Amino acid sequence: MKDQFARLAAWQPFAKAGNWPDADMLAIGELKPHPGYGEPRSSRLTYDEQKTLLTLWAIAKSPLIVGANLTLLDAKTLTLLTNADVIALDQEGTGEFEAKHEGAMIAWRTSLPKEREALAIFNTGDTPLSVQRDFADFDADLGTRHWKVTDAWAGQELGRQRGVDATLAPHSCLLLVLSPEKLLPEKLLPKLHKEHE
C-alpha cells in the first residue's frame, strides 16, 4: 500500500478529464479470487489501513473498484464503501495534488463544489504521529479563509478551525472537509453591535 502514495503522486500531472490514475482494485472485505489464483480470504489490511486505502484512492480520483464479494460485505466494510463524503472526493474533486510529504506524514488536497476543500492527512509510519499544523502549512491558499471543518470519516462537525491538532495511529488517516465560513463585512459589525445594545 505504501508504494501507491509515490505512484499516485507521480501520475497526478497526467490526471485530467477523461484520464484517471488507476490504482487497481480496493482490497477490502471478503476477497474471493478466480479459481486457480489463491484461496478465498479476508482482507489482510487493518481497519485503519482500509480507510487509508480508500481515502487515498478517492482523493487521487482513482476508479473505486471493489475487489470484495459484495454478497459477503459486513456492516463495517459496507460503511467504509458507502461514505458519501469519500465518494464525493472521487466523483467531484478537482485539482487534487500531494500537498505535503514530510517523513511519515503525507497530505493530499482537492477542491470540491460550493467552495469547499478536502484535506487528507496520512500517517504512513509504524508509530503514532502528532500533527499540529495550520491549514496554511499544507497550502497557502487554505490560510486565506475561515473554515468550518467536518471529520468525514467520523461524521463529526469540528466547528471553526484554522488548522489541525490530532494524533494519527500508525497507517491511519484524517479526512477533513473544509467549508468556507461566511463572515459579515467588518463595516457591518459596529452597526449590529449598536442595534443590540
Over which residues does each language-model region extend?
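Generic recognition of flexible, low-complexity loop/linker segments
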Residues: S43-T46, M105-R109, G163-V164
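C-terminal beta-strand-rich structural cap/linker in extracellular carbohydrate-active enzymes
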Residues: G159-K194
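Catalytic cores of secreted or luminal carbohydrate-active enzymes
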Residues: T52-K100
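Solvent-exposed beta-hairpin/edge-strand motifs
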Residues: A136-W153
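Flexible loop/turn segments at secondary-structure boundaries
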Residues: H34-P35, I65-G67, L73-T77, D126-L129, ...
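Glycan-recognition surfaces
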Residues: M1-A68
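Hydrophobic, well-ordered secondary-structure elements that form the walls
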Residues: L119, V149, H171
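Carbohydrate-binding surface patches
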Residues: W57-A60, I65-G67, H101-A140
